[in-house]
Amino acid sequence: MEGPEGLGRKQACLAMLLHFLDTYQGLLQEEEGAGHIIKDLYLLIMKDESLYQGLREDTLRLHQLVETVELKIPEENQPPSKQVKPLFRHFRRIDSCLQTRVAFRGSDEIFCRVYMPDHSYVTIRSRLSASVQDILGSVTEKLQYSEEPAGREDSLILVAVSSSGEKVLLQPTEDCVFTALGINSHLFACTRDSYEALVPLPEEIQVSPGDTEIHRVEPEDVANHLTAFHWELFRCVHELEFVDYVFHGERGRRETANLELLLQRCSEVTHWVATEVLLCEAPGKRAQLLKKFIKIAALCKQNQDLLSFYAVVMGLDNAAVSRLRLTWEKLPGKFKNLFRKFENLTDPCRNHKSYREVISKMKPPVIPFVPLILKDLTFLHEGSKTLVDGLVNIEKLHSVAEKVRTIRKYRSRPLYLDMEASPHHLQTKAYVRQFQVIDNQNLLFELSYKLEANSQ
């Protein structure tokens, strides 16, 4: 590769490596051997840099990028020092929920409670990507030092139990189960004999009607904190996670932890809206609450936070809420008309035409309705083969890349919201980041019928 042609090829290879490192950065630390490969490439490039003066500028950029990415090769017998990261409901600790969200990686460590059939629990420290077998091993180790009978840890299985009592037996080879849990689901370790007797935790089905925090906060504060939090979560999702989620499904769960959490949060906000409305017993206050949520939806749309906007509207459209005819009749006509416009905007007819028209006019920063992005990618993936007659379907990959570039555009500018001027800034922030919700639709309907038994 001597001469100008050789230099051009080397520059092209170096440019591709720079783009690769810039795009994937921290993800490379999750791949075994990535550090060695990049180091070997870097040393080879340094050799050529002395022969080709035209490589000097790109080599300097590579050196800076490698330092930024921090591709460190761990020494033998030297365990890495990691800080334990909190999940959404990490023991309801205020200090945890106020922290700025950072991206999760499979090797990150978290605390988790694993429950027994009698609702006692053990707390384990585990990697986010830990397999079911690893989790059960940690539980067994904990139980050996408890005062429980020694036979209790024999032949344990791991089960995810939802608030409605639905049980999912997890297979030993499954991994990253923490981020795949439902909103109010918990992990239970038990023997096969006690599987059928598992019931949800009592606190997940206890309901205490009355005024809650939502009645005391301003719509502007709630909308701004929703947008700020969801921007943090959206920024944590690497663009590759969208592709892995669709192309690899459950096999790529380790690589899609942040996306799983964002989707879970969207569902959580939807159930939060329904929960707050249905826990409000006074008809007048309930109508005021509908009005407040419509205001919050409008402000989220104004903030270009379409994820929160969609979630709030879907919460108000929950069948247990929408059937409250007497409550909706108390709503002023202005807000009824506004909500109809919001329903039209979220209407999926004609491939979400109304939504697409609105978001196409927005300039970054934008928080899109993420499930629709996944729907579009799924259509691209399932609508055509990746390989055709043994050749790569370039047209399909170009379409996927265009969708990824759109995601990148939404995040191309920082988000600025002035929230600290509010006297209850931290209180509202804590409230918004750790919603208490009912995700059991049967229970929501029970509450709805208690409020208005004969509504049509």
UniProtKB/Swiss-Prot annotation:
Keywords: Guanine-nucleotide releasing factor. PROSITE patterns: RASGEF_CAT. Gene3D superfamilies: Phosphatidylinositol 3-kinase Catalytic Subunit, Chain A, domain 1, Ras guanine-nucleotide exchange factors catalytic domain, Son of sevenless (SoS) protein Chain: S domain 1. The keyword Transferase does not apply. GO terms for biological process: Ras protein signal transduction. GO terms for molecular function: guanyl-nucleotide exchange factor activity. CDD domains: RasGEF. It comes from the Eukaryota. The keyword Zinc does not apply. GO terms for cellular component: plasma membrane. Signal peptide: none annotated. Residues 218-454 form the Ras-GEF domain. InterPro entries: Ras-like_GEF, Ras_GEF_dom_sf, RASGEF_cat_dom, RASGEF_cat_dom_sf, Ubiquitin-like_domsf. Probable guanine nucleotide exchange factor (GEF). This is Rap guanine nucleotide exchange factor-like 1. It comes from Pongo pygmaeus. The lineage of its organism: Eukaryota, Metazoa, Chordata, Craniata, Vertebrata. The gene is RAPGEFL1.
